[in-house]
């Protein structure tokens, strides 16, 4: 049943508009290219700058070693590697997905902003669909009580996160009607925070900061070998379905 749900959501979300544009990102791409299958972009940042509602970004397989100078934004507390602030619509989602059966991997080993929490995908946009990729080696640089996250949903509504593997977890504070489907969060530990004990990293954190942030769901997700909780709802001000 999980597979059928995922496939139907993918076709509803990513292939609804036949007039939409498809962009491609590849490890051997170049951001001066046109972003086509034959001439792909090199970075997700470039593709994100081009998309409009209904578009799909196909990420080719391979390992993408992200550099610190590629970070898109941040604030006094956080560094945003990919700032996903563009929104789709109910009828035309924006999709970011691994291409066909390929499995892209985003490696964050080199992103270590001093004194900042790392949010690899900082998602404030709505009606987005993220599918079929992996995020590894998300770094923690603060020795106090803290953590970093692979995905941080901060204000985005009606987003779908599907078939993702995350080595530093998922975190939601603001947003409604977001679906996390068939995702894995595992081996989440860092040797830096908590004065070197690294015991504060969860697999999935569902912490809606307001009673109005309703309709959020973890479905078919797995969490294991995490240094803190597999699923943490300790600060949730609204019901969260698991």
Map each language-model feature to its residues.
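Acidic Gly/Asp/Thr-rich repetitive segments characteristic of extracellular carbohydrate-active
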Residues: 27-66, 81-82
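Structural signal for short hydrophobic segments within the conserved structured cores
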Residues: 21-23, 39, 104
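Loop/turn elements at helix/coil->beta-strand transitions in domains of secreted/extracellular proteins
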Residues: 21-22, 53-56, 92-93, 101
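Right-handed parallel beta-helix
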Residues: 60-61, 93, 97-103, 126-137, ...
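Bacterial Sec-dependent N-terminal signal peptides
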Residues: 1-21
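Structural recognition of the beta-strand scaffold that forms the well-ordered cores
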Residues: 23-24, 58, 232
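Extracellular beta-strand/beta-solenoid scaffold signature
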Residues: 72-84, 111-121, 143-153, 167-172, ...
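Right-handed parallel beta-helix/beta-spiral solenoid domain characteristic of secreted/periplasmic
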Residues: 61, 65-74, 81-145
């Amino acid at each position: 049943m999980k597979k059928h749900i995922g496939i139907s959501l993918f076709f509803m979300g990513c292939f609804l508009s036949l007039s939409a544009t498809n962009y491609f990102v590849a490890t051997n791409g170049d951001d001066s290219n046109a972003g086509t299958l034959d001439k792909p972009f090199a970075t997700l940042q470039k593709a994100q700058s081009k998309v409009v509602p209904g578009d799909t970004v196909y990420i080719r397989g391979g390992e993408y070693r992200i550099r610190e100078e590629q970070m898109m934004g941040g604030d006094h507390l956080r560094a945003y590697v990919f700032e996903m602030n563009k929104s789709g619509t109910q009828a035309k989602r924006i999709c970011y997905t691994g291409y066909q059966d390929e499995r892209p991997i985003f490696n964050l080993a080199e992103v270590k902003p001093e004194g900042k929490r790392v949010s690899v995908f900082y998602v404030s946009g709505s009606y987005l669909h993220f599918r079929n990729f992996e995020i590894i080696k998300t770094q923690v640089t603060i020795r106090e009580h803290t953590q970093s996250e692979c995905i941080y949903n901060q204000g985005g509504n009606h987003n779908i996160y599907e078939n993702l593997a995350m080595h530093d977890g998922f975190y939601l504070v603001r947003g409604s009607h977001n679906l996390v489907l068939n995702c894995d969060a595992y081996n989440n530990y860092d040797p830096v925070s908590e004065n070197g004990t690294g015991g504060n990293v969860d697999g999935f954190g569902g912490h809606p900061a307001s009673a109005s942030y309703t309709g959020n769901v973890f479905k078919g997700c797995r969490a294991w070998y995490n240094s803190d909780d597999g699923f943490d709802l300790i600060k949730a001000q609204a019901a969260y379905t698991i």
